[in-house]
Amino acid sequence: MWGRGFLQRARFAQLSPSSSSSRSLLSAASAAPPNLLYSHYQRGRWFGCSTANMAPVRDPNTLSNYDAWRTRHTTANLKIDFTAKCLRGSVILELESQTDKASKEIVLDSSYVTVNSIKLNSAPSLWETKARTEPNGSPVHIAVPEGAAKGEVVKVEIELATTDKCTALQWLTPAQTSDKAAPFMFSQCQAIHARSLFPCQDTPDVKSTYDFNITSPYVVVASGVPVPDETKDLGEEKLYKFQQKVPIPSYLFALSSGEIASAPVGKRSCVCTGPNELKASQWELEGDMDKFLEAAEKIVFPYRWGEYNVLVLPPSFPYGGMENPIFTFATPTIISGDKQNIDVIAHELAHSWSGNLVTSCSWEHFWLNEGWTMYLERRILASIHGGDAHFDFSAIRGWKALEEAIKEYGEDHEFTKLCISHKGIDPDDAFSTVPYEKGFHFVWSLDRLVGRENFDKFIPYYFGKWSNKSLDSYEFKDTFLEFFSAPEYSDLKDKIASIDWEGRFHSTGLPPKPEFDTSLADVCYELAEKWKSKDFTPSPSDVASWTGNQVLVFLNAVQDFEEPLTVEQSQALGKAYGLSESKNAELKAAYYHIAMRSKDASAYQGVADLLGEVGRMKFVRPLFRGLNKVDRELALKTFEKNREFYHPICRQMVEKDLGVSEAANSS
């Protein structure tokens, strides 16, 4: 056991990035064997000081000891280096002690980050990066020899640089952008990728306020409110500052930089995107942003984040949208020229309450974020479009997606549960429609059980009680039961007692199917029935008055035929309704699934072309799986051609879908 004197003489520990288990090098004792200070280290113990009596962490996807220390504020002083394709600089974490000097170390999550030095309260600190374990990365252990009194805040300053293995960042060359003039970068930290930007407590169970001080030669966007008065010109670069005063989890840390222009689209909103896309993006979104905000505020309570803006990213962005606060990061597939795909914005806006303000404590309870958000999204859209028929119409589409996801996994698969065990599981591997739609159906079932008028009173109560906090499924259950235990709801006692909470949380497969209002979908089903006859002659007028979503429901119904269309029918479908030439990626992708099921080889190259234009996983993964079944050679060729176009998260998932992970990793 090494005493205090030796510790005080040791100046700092430095990471050797080439080492699989990074070594601590002591400048005051360079002759000491590697890891000498850690030879007697055990988790929960530093120099004989036990933390065994502390409450356990409840997130299996973090290696941090956030039960002993909690990040309260984060300052990111980072330079965006487009030449080296990395972020470099320092991050300062202000951590509050949760014990009375019982913990003698801080443990942070990290993944493929080069750490150059760490200071504790401005003084060099002992630290070590431990060996990597999948899927959670390499924990960074920082000595706090004297511990800290309960409630005391310590500052940890980390000098660092990201590496080429960073899973949170995508770097685009000028050629990969529309105007071909400048490079572009953006981050995607959900689920556990913030740790590849900087060591942190990378768990949704910890929330921090943020200061962003970001230097770049191009415009910067971050998940905070811009502080334009403090932007500084540094010659070829500028320092951009943002503040996030509402505490957020690490997965909502977001950065983007490039040739970005902006335009107003509402009283509290602007759209940001490439200069070439600005006019089309502004047209697509203006007129709806204020409506979405006002509708959401009536359902929950006033928006607490100040601004609500949208950054429309290049095509390789892997999601429909990412609910980064202040600036939703959105796929360009929503800019379809017909305002048919902006439901995504209603969804991401709803996250301002469900997910961002009130957060699931771990990815095992992800449905609390997404199920609630689907519910709020549908309430928002129903209030704008005029009634429950629109709510049910969207829910019908969601049920179809849920059926497909569960069919893909299998009825008894762990990932078809609401509450999923994530021990040893990468949350990205468990990502699917299930937490969205199965979660929605649970929330909606509670709404129907107690009645809309009563449920509408519960909504602001729930979001008010858990604002700026994180919770698990059982805390949600307790909150629901607490609210409806009030005397005025005594007539609901028997109904509430009938809720099968355990079954809802832990049963695999589909939930009970509700009775949908099919009034907006019936016409779609009627047209689909006509396509079962090989003698049917289609006409563009069949769908001329329909919304894009009605066309999508029709296509989904055709896709479900027991007997696929013939090649001739498939080609007639694409031609008559203009699907293969559509600018709407939703419709185009749905049509290509029908064509592949029909074995229409003339459509396969169109599938490959679309896969080179869109990086959104909602389209990319199913299309690759479909193409792989009918033409594996083309699927592999298409993936290799576009490998660098896809975001690292998307690329990794497609590798698994195509069964090329091992080959790719060994090459």
Curated annotation (Swiss-Prot):
GO terms for molecular function: aminopeptidase activity; epoxide hydrolase activity; metallopeptidase activity; zinc ion binding. Binds 1 zinc ion per subunit. It comes from the Eukaryota. It is found in: Cytoplasm; Nucleus. It catalyses: an epoxide + H2O = an ethanediol. Aminopeptidase that preferentially cleaves di- and tripeptides. Also has low epoxide hydrolase activity (in vitro). Can hydrolyze the epoxide leukotriene LTA(4) but it forms preferentially 5,6-dihydroxy-7,9,11,14-eicosatetraenoic acid rather than the cytokine leukotriene B(4) as the product compared to the homologous mammalian enzyme (in vitro). NCBIfam families: leuko_A4_hydro. This is Leucine aminopeptidase 2. It comes from Neurospora crassa (strain ATCC 24698 / 74-OR23-1A / CBS 708.71 / DSM 1257 / FGSC 987).
